[in-house]
From Swiss-Prot:
InterPro entries: Acetyltransf_C, Acetyltransf_C_sf, Hexapep, Hexapep_transf_CS, Lipid_A_LpxA, Trimer_LpxA-like_sf
Gene source species: Campylobacter jejuni (strain RM1221)
CDD domains noted in UniProt: LbH_UDP-GlcNAc_AT
Cellular compartment(s): Cytoplasm
Keyword annotations of the record: Acyltransferase, Cytoplasm, Lipid A biosynthesis, Lipid biosynthesis, Lipid metabolism, Repeat, Transferase
Biological function: Involved in the biosynthesis of lipid A, a phosphorylated glycolipid that anchors the lipopolysaccharide to the outer membrane of the cell.
Pathway membership, UniProt: Glycolipid biosynthesis; lipid IV(A) biosynthesis; lipid IV(A) from (3R)-3-hydroxytetradecanoyl-[acyl-carrier-protein] and UDP-N-acetyl-alpha-D-glucosamine: step 1/6
Protein name (Swiss-Prot/TrEMBL): Acyl-[acyl-carrier-protein]--UDP-N-acetylglucosamine O-acyltransferase
Documented EC number(s): 2.3.1.129
Amino acid sequence: MKKIHPSAVIEEGAQLGDDVVVEAYAYVSKDAKIGNNVVIKQGARILSDTTIGDHSRVFSYAIVGDIPQDISYKEEQKSGVVIGKNATIREFATINSGTAKGDGFTRIGDNAFIMAYCHIAHDCLLGNNIILANNATLAGHVELGDFTVVGGLTPIHQFVKVGEGCMIAGASALSQDIVPFCLAEGNRASIRSLNLVGTRRRFDKDEVDRLSRAFKTLFRQGDLKENAKNLLENQESENVKKMCHFILETKRGIPVYRGKNNA
């Protein structure tokens, strides 16, 4: 059964699933689509054509789907935000709607954990199982692969791509693309090592060893793109292939490797 506080504003046309809770002074726009068992806490605002998946929670004063901070945006453009299942969006986080420069939607996958005061700008594409620590700031068109963790107080430049399974240390600043399964740190961020903690959580020892050998082959000496091409030959590991293809397809470049001895 839905629980809607009398002071909440639910515009006519909004679609609310089963057992949705909307607390005091929250606002849900007419084009919003809210899944089952979603909790929208006090003062949160769900705007524009925004979809929020089942079992998600939007905490107090978070704003999801407000217009993008883009001077070329025309308000008559159809835009919104799409968020998957089991999302947690903490206090004062802001997630802007997309623009015509993308497909009109900012997109976030399942199981996102977005901590307080984070900002996700227009047209960002975030995969599944993303964690953004407090005050992480994503500019427009940023892409984060599945299982990426971004530390607190970290800004990411527009159009940067961060590959699957990366760890970005807190108080870093990214202006270039980060290869899948890597740990990056610093201002400006450099690649420091394989993300051993993240890879060990997800893969068996043999696959972690393959990724570790691939990392050393790619980064320790020689030209990065030539190393990636050579490593792709007769490569059986799909995850190593992801690393190589990412390097060969980067648009913003890969930052300088400043490694740790145990990478």
